[in-house]
Amino acid sequence: MKTIGFVDFYIDEWHANNYPAWIEETCKKTGADFKIAYAWAESDRPPEGGLSTAEWCDKFGVKKCDTVEELCEKSDYILVL
């Protein structure tokens, strides 16, 4: 399985909330083996409220990385959102 890491200013946003399902659906259709496994955000929470990075990670079954360097080391692919 190839792992994907998400990098964003804050992670609880439209792209990060929708891409995991789209990637999973595409993998099922094509037989590819990718998974959103890691996330890192510069800001812990959107300015208008919402999930913290840790809460988002719990919701999506993703590991929160403490640094962008950690995410880069662990991920096979990186999506900058």
Model-derived segments and spans:
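N-terminal glycine-/serine-/threonine-rich beta1-alpha1-beta2 phosphate-ribose binding loop
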Residues: 1-81
